């Protein structure tokens, strides 16, 4: 998996189709040096069969379901490639921007698979234990010096899977190791929330043929209650056809 990810990363860099993100992007926290960015490899579902098992990993999925409920939807699957000299990402919550008020329960959970060893030296993700129970605070307050001191840098070997719920404050650290640190993030939602990646639109045809019916459920190819039907009716993942035409104008 690490070899396939590195190949994909280098290929996207070569053809300049990869994504970049500033450490402060979207959070209202100003930074000074434009070049300090993280590279992202989005939508890994299309980029190697080895990534498909992360949709419903048998050891991980039950933990996600324990946290946010039996029915889950994959929000996104992508890799963070943090080079030496990257900008430290602002502390943030994955769940809070989706709703305008604090929630007493998580509807989102994140799994981070460590493709590299993680340590404070190479910018291991910073987490604030217990912050999922905090009252709502804004991003500038959360990134004040007093709050930053509460963050703990992740230290764990490659191959580890780290799981946290969507209300926990976290963010990438500063990489000063001289090497790239890579992690794969798979985020899950309760299925009433719109995912980050539109899987029905973005999954390539040759990949769709390899995905199991269980995985299609998790990718949102089936309705949730009365949500997500086609022409008002439910469609099972087995019968899902993105090219199926909807009923148009008719006359007697």
Give the positions of each predicted feature.
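A short, structural micro-pattern
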Residues: 73, 105-107, 178-180
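Conserved double-stranded beta-helix
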Residues: 134-139, 143-163, 167-168, 173-252
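Non-heme Fe(II)-dependent double-stranded beta-helix
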Residues: 1-91, 97-98
